[in-house]
Amino acid sequence: VDKSACLQPKEVGPCRKSDFVFFYNADTKACEEFLYGGCRGNDNRFNTKEECEKLCL
């Protein structure tokens, strides 16, 4: 995953699992939590806030 992932929109995906993960919000310039459905989505999804901040901030 490269830094371009940080510019992708938040993508929940079509599945119905509820995993708390993080994405980089380019509007607020912060890593924020969201509920990920568990499948598909994109690369702007991180297991921890620290992983998100390491790549995107």
UniProtKB/Swiss-Prot annotation:
Reactive bond for trypsin, annotated site positions: 16-17
UniProt key word NAD: no
InterPro entries: Kunitz_BPTI, Kunitz_BPTI_sf, Prtase_inh_Kunz-CS, TFPI/VKTCI-like
Disulfide cysteine pairs (residue numbers): 6-56, 15-39, 31-52
GO MF annotation list: serine-type endopeptidase inhibitor activity
Gene Ontology annotations for the cellular component aspect, listed alphabetically: extracellular space
Keyword vocabulary terms for this entry: Disulfide bond, Protease inhibitor, Serine protease inhibitor
Domain BPTI/Kunitz inhibitor: 6-56
Pfam families attached to this UniProt entry: Kunitz_BPTI
Function, as annotated: Seems to inhibit trypsin.
PANTHER family linked to this entry: KUNITZ-TYPE PROTEASE INHIBITOR-RELATED, TISSUE FACTOR PATHWAY INHIBITOR
Protein name as it appears in the record: Protease inhibitor
Species annotation: Sarcophaga bullata
